[in-house]
């Protein structure tokens, strides 16, 4: 017989153990001391204490952060599975249950446990219980894995086994109000820990508004409201593991329930702060409303279906708290990074001075919010290591950057180019400031000898060298380009890390989609009220066609309440403008996975979720032939030529534009508008289209001032049904 220590509870003296998510131990310690627990000891994910039965009951009813509350029953030596059976067989189970009592056994093992299989260890304990009752002349008690009358827990660490009664019966995160969870619901006890560590409970008088801008099913808001209203988290539960325990003190438990009801009634009568939640997913918002009603807090918490981009502050002070998407998969990380950037930008713009707390899994992405974090806590959401970061939103800084023309003497061989470049700068910088434009062209092959274009993107400059005519010596062209580049740097006083150079040449087939280098570095720029990611290094084009600026701005102005379709959508910039303009939905179709991912990042950067803004990977002509939806506005900006092996087709804009536009017009709703643009310099629109549709040439008005020197930068038409 193995050594056995009887630690069965004596009257008014019990040993309890609370299990919890890693990082919540100190919060539980404070709770236990508030319940009059003594000799509190913290472990890794555990809190042990001594106290009366009342302290255990209070922990079950009031602990917001614990997962389970265990009552220590016995401790014994374990050198094999047989020792588990022998100690179970000799234990006096009658003090806790009868043969009519349903029961369950859980088992956990430390890494150095002398037994190697938790399920088999639990089975040996179960066998000992059953055989004990049979030995005593009773019938065999029944095992019930879900909500048994009593649940026992055995933990083996090294060669020491400890037997517990699970007072909670099932995890205490099950408050009883959750009707449905989202894709990855946050457990209630972890949510409560996030709220507590955010500092809001102590600051709530100074922070009269609590907003979760990505509220999911509302767990953070519900837990915060329960804290404020002094609502016991276990009050709505109808199951605990002690209700059929033979030593259960029903009078004590009823007294604690009555006290909790009285405290809740008093809490609900207080003057409440504002609790608001928002989410872009209407299905999730519906679940949140159901949970809030189930929790009895629908009078105090309001949730609405709205994307992050529409967030605004209802009061001067408050707190934004959220558990945003993590982006655990590599393909989602960049999209999540842009969502965090949007959250930070919106926070600085509309919530300056507000407290903020975000719970994320990747600490490297915390920088994306651009918040000076004051505190950081390491917590675990299941097995995922996470960080809770808290701070205050600083006021959004005005973009103080401005291009300045330096008063420098350029070398004689650069005079011709320098004079024209400075003249253009004066003209277009003044124009851009007046029109609130930050990305524009300032030189477009104005001089035949200097065959390049120069674009300004915020504080970066993008220089493109074009292949010289065959009549020009390549070495001479190269020298001229270097002369111009030197002059550009001197006139604008540029650091080398702000200048990006590309050599343009005719792209064939998939070449237009190929990377120009190995590194991918994105920069954020603004156009109107939209923000976009541009890449100056890795692809021939940056991700933002500057000559289409007027078209995109028009789409934004005219999209309120409309369904928008973007064919050959590239990086989705027109779709984002439509969304910012209040489009009911956007659909962006492109055959390139790279550009569709880029589109999704652009949407995230602007604070839009994917619910009403879908991306479709498809050949546009094939997709149009199968599509059945109608759209109010359609933008068609196809390539001049593409040879796509995956689609097994060659596209030629001159040859195929009748088929393309005819199919697209079938998807145009009555009274709708289709805008067609092409940059094929020798393009001729087939006259048959004008016979079939109401066609208007808007090329001149669609070309902005900074591209007016090149009348064939693109052609553009409006199409309407006759």
Swiss-Prot record:
InterPro entries: 23SrRNA_methyltr_KL, RlmKL-like_Mtase, RlmKL-like_Mtase_CS, RlmL_1st, SAM-dep_methyl-trfase, SAM-dependent_MTases_sf, THUMP_dom. It is found in: Cytoplasm. It is an enzyme of class 2 (transferase). The keyword Transferase applies. Residues 55-167 form the THUMP domain. Keywords: Cytoplasm, Methyltransferase, RNA-binding, rRNA processing, S-adenosyl-L-methionine, Transferase. Transmembrane segments: none annotated. Gene3D superfamilies: 3.30.2130.30, RNA methyltransferase domain (HRMD) like, Vaccinia Virus protein VP39. Its EC number is 2.1.1.173, 2.1.1.264. Its main location: cytoplasm. SMART domains: THUMP. GO terms for molecular function: 23S rRNA (guanine(2445)-N(2))-methyltransferase activity; RNA binding; rRNA (guanine-N7-)-methyltransferase activity. It catalyses: guanosine(2445) in 23S rRNA + S-adenosyl-L-methionine = N(2)-methylguanosine(2445) in 23S rRNA + S-adenosyl-L-homocysteine + H(+); guanosine(2069) in 23S rRNA + S-adenosyl-L-methionine = N(2)-methylguanosine(2069) in 23S rRNA + S-adenosyl-L-homocysteine + H(+). One of its GO terms (cellular component) is cytoplasm. Specifically methylates the guanine in position 2445 (m2G2445) and the guanine in position 2069 (m7G2069) of 23S rRNA. Belongs to the methyltransferase superfamily. RlmKL family. This is Ribosomal RNA large subunit methyltransferase K/L. It comes from Desulfotalea psychrophila (strain LSv54 / DSM 12343).
């Amino acid at each position: 017989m193995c050594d056995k220590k009887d630690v069965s509870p004596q009257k008014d003296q019990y040993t309890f153990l609370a299990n919890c998510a890693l990082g919540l131990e100190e919060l539980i310690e404070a709770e236990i001391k508030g319940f009059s627990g003594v000799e509190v000891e913290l472990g890794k994910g555990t809190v042990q204490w001594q106290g009366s039965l009342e302290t255990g009951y209070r922990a079950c009813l009031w602990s917001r952060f614990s997962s389970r509350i265990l009552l220590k029953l016995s401790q014994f030596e374990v050198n094999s599975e047989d020792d588990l059976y022998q100690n179970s067989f000799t234990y006096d189970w009658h003090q806790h249950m009868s043969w009519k009592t349903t029961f369950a056994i859980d088992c956990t093992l430390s890494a150095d446990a002398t037994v190697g299989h938790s399920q088999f260890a639990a089975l040996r304990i179960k066998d000992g219980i059953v055989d004990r009752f049979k030995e005593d002349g009773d019938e065999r008690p029944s095992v019930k894995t879900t909500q048994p009358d009593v649940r026992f827990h055995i933990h083996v660490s090294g060669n020491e086994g400890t037997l517990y009664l699970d007072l909670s019966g099932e995890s205490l995160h099950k408050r009883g109000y959750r009707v449905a969870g989202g894709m990855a619901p946050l457990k209630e006890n972890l949510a409560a820990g996030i709220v507590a560590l955010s500092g809001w409970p102590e600051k709530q008088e100074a922070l009269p508004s609590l907003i979760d801008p990505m509220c999911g099913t509302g767990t953070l808001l519900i837990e915060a409201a329960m804290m404020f209203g002094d609502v016991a988290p276990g009050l709505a539960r109808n199951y605990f593991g002690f209700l059929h325990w033979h030593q259960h003190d029903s009078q004590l438990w009823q007294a604690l329930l009555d006290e909790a009801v009285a405290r809740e009634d008093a809490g609900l009568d207080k003057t409440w702060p504002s609790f608001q939640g928002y989410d872009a997913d209407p299905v999730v918002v519906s679940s949140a409303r159901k949970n809030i009603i189930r929790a009895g807090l629908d009078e105090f918490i309001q949730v609405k279906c709205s994307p992050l981009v529409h967030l605004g502050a209802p009061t001067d002070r408050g707190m934004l708290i959220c558990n945003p998407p993590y982006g655990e998969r590599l393909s989602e990380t960049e999209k999540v990074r842009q969502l965090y950037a949007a959250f930070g930008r919106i926070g600085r713009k509309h919530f300056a001075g507000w407290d903020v707390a975000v719970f994320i899994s990747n600490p490297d992405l915390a920088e994306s919010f651009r918040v000076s974090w004051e505190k950081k806590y390491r917590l675990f959401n299941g097995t995922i290591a996470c960080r809770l970061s808290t701070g205050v939103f600083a006021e959004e800084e005005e973009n103080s950057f401005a291009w300045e023309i330096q008063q420098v003497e350029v070398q004689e061989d650069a005079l011709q180019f320098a004079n024209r470049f400075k003249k253009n700068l004066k003209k277009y910088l003044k124009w851009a400031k007046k029109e609130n434009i930050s990305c524009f062209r300032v030189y477009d092959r104005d001089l035949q000898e200097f065959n390049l274009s120069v674009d300004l993107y915020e504080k970066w400059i993008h220089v493109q060298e074009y292949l010289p005519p065959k009549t020009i010596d390549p070495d001479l062209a190269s020298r001229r380009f270097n002369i111009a580049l030197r002059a550009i740097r001197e006139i604008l006083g540029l650091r080398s890390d702000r200048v990006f150079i590309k050599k343009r040449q005719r792209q064939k087939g998939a070449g237009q989609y190929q990377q120009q280098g190995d590194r991918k570095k994105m920069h954020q720029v603004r156009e109107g009220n939209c923000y976009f990611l541009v890449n100056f290094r890795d692809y021939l084009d940056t991700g933002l066609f500057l000559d289409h600026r007027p078209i995109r701005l028009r789409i934004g102005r005219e999209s309120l309440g409309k369904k928008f379709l973007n064919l050959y959508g590239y990086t989705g910039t027109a779709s984002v403008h439509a969304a910012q303009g209040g489009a009911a939905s956007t659909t962006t179709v492109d055959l390139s996975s790279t550009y569709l991912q880029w589109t999704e990042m652009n949407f995230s950067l602007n604070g839009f979720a994917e619910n009403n803004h879908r991306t479709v990977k498809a050949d546009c002509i094939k997709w149009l032939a199968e599509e059945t939806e109608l759209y109010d506005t359609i933008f068609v900006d196809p390539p001049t030529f593409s040879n796509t092996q995956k689609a097994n087709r060659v596209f030629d804009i001159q040859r195929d534009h009748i088929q393309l536009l005819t199919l697209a017009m079938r998807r145009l709703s009555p009274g709708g508008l289709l805008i067609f643009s092409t940059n094929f310099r020798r393009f001729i629109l087939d006259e048959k289209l004008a016979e079939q549709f109401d066609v208007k040439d808007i090329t001149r008005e669609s070309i902005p001032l900074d591209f007016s020197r090149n009348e064939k930068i693109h052609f553009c038409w409006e199409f309407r049904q006759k």
